[in-house]
Amino acid sequence: MKYLVAGLGNVGQKYENSRHNIGFMILDALAKASSVVFTDKCYGAIASLKLKNKCLFLLKPSTYMNLSGNAIRYWLQKENIYSENLLILVDDLSLPFGSLRLKTKGSDGGHNGLKNIQYTLRTKYYNRLRFGIGNNFPSGCQINYVLDNFTKEEKKHLSERIEKAIEIVYSFCLSGSEITMNLFNK
């Protein structure tokens, strides 16, 4: 069985360590732990790995956040992957820093990457792992906040939370969304 795990983020060194790029960070850590390397392909950087009898395609779209749906649709079609085997890794302002929540459907929550995915796939029924980045910013400064790097205090806990996100990805692919939500959404 095939899975597409897509991390949302923006390409370029300028954004590499920003809160908005947590999806890319999780995929980079997952690729490193699995000893696989990303290759630049159509619509993004892609890596693949075997997890027991599953084939995981890891995608970092090169379309920038607001057009992520194009890359995701392309790779779903190219690899003939069912949408229920799609998992989006995304930052979430409404969750405290480091909180992790798996959802099988829902609104875009104001996230432009999710908006584009829902528009492009024509559905809100797809899996997403929401990584809390908090909302510790003054009114009107949301864009600066998500594009800023994590604070020193947040960085102390970042690798541990990324490791937990990887556990959730593995569980999703091996056990499915319901079991994974029951195990990790606490």
Swiss-Prot record:
TRNA binds at Y15, Y64, N66, N112. It catalyses: an N-acyl-L-alpha-aminoacyl-tRNA + H2O = an N-acyl-L-amino acid + a tRNA + H(+). InterPro entries: Pept_tRNA_hydro, Pept_tRNA_hydro_CS, Pept_tRNA_hydro_sf. GO terms for cellular component: cytoplasm. Pfam families: Pept_tRNA_hydro. The record marks N10 as: Discriminates between blocked and unblocked aminoacyl-tRNA. The active site is at H20 (proton acceptor). It is found in: Cytoplasm. Its EC number is 3.1.1.29. The record marks D91 as: Stabilizes the basic form of H active site to accept a proton. Its main location: cytoplasm. GO terms for biological process: protein quality control for misfolded or incompletely synthesized proteins; rescue of stalled ribosome. SUPFAM superfamilies: Peptidyl-tRNA hydrolase-like. One of its GO terms (molecular function) is peptidyl-tRNA hydrolase activity. Keywords: Cytoplasm, Hydrolase, RNA-binding, tRNA-binding. Belongs to the PTH family. Monomer. Hydrolyzes ribosome-free peptidyl-tRNAs (with 1 or more amino acids incorporated), which drop off the ribosome during protein synthesis, or as a result of ribosome stalling. Catalyzes the release of premature peptidyl moieties from peptidyl-tRNA molecules trapped in stalled 50S ribosomal subunits, and thus maintains levels of free tRNAs and 50S ribosomes. This is Peptidyl-tRNA hydrolase. It comes from Azobacteroides pseudotrichonymphae genomovar. CFP2. The lineage of its organism: Bacteria, Pseudomonadati, Bacteroidota, Bacteroidia, Bacteroidales.
